[in-house]
Amino acid sequence: MKFLSFKHNDRTSYGVKVKREDAVWDLPMVFAEFGDKDFNPKTLIAGLQQNQTLDFQEQVRKAVVAAEESGRDEEFKLLFTDIDFLPPVTPPNNVIAFGRNYEDHASELNHEVDSLYVFTKAASSLTGDEATIPNHKDITEQLDYEGELGIVIGKSGEKIPRGLALDYIYGYTIINDITDRTAQSSHDQAFLSKSLTGACPMGPYIVTKDELPAPENVNIVTKVNNEIRQDGNTGEMILKIDELIEKISKYVALHPGDIIATGTPAGVGAGLQPPQFLQPGDEVKVTIDNIGTLTTYISKN
């Protein structure tokens, strides 16, 4: 399943992509009409939280099938052209990112890879697919892109052993870890350089892990104005997904909806010769196999 959150006519909602259609089932409406008893989570985060005790996907499947068989299915669908995409989840807790997890990317920026490099991004930096974000020209001339695979946590845990780590994953998404290289080079920590408004585009979907059975062998392609800048594969990650979860959960309790960005391959603007940073009016597309394409526009003004 592909889950998404959206805004329609000033109403915020969430849903699941209609198969073979550019449309979404509006799940709160579907659940209200066809759901089991009082099961009607109002947000995707609430659905993930309830998934710890109840099979959320099964509840979705049964309700959608009932809607399809009712003959009134069009009442519960919205076309993508009629909605604004939001971040699939807005975590109440953590947006955690791993840096220097691709050796070629670390090398292009002359960074060491012999130690764990972890940082957080402010939840206020999150934005959805097709969003236009500030160009931040008032503070930097070095705004950069980083296409990444994102892990979405599905159940609570800490000190999770590597052998059980994959059980804590609900699904995967796409993240563009937009970075202010000026701030990054002038501060010892990464939080400020990674947390500008709009600096964490995410989406367009959360793809459930059953639909991405080999997340460590998917291509990541980032294009700026249709020019390929990054062309990597998650198989190149230094620390694999189960290792990332084991290492971070040793210190940080994870909860449903928490996001872990797994690092970016080579090809960022700062690593090119000469460097090529994002400019007003640019279009950035990050595509990951079997998830989709995350599009971000840099404001002209």
Swiss-Prot record:
Keywords: Metal-binding. Signal peptide: none annotated. One of its GO terms (molecular function) is metal ion binding. It comes from the Bacteria. PANTHER family: ACYLPYRUVASE (PTHR11820), ACYLPYRUVASE FAHD1, MITOCHONDRIAL (PTHR11820:SF7). Belongs to the FAH family. This is Uncharacterized protein SERP0556. It comes from Staphylococcus epidermidis (strain ATCC 35984 / DSM 28319 / BCRC 17069 / CCUG 31568 / BM 3577 / RP62A).
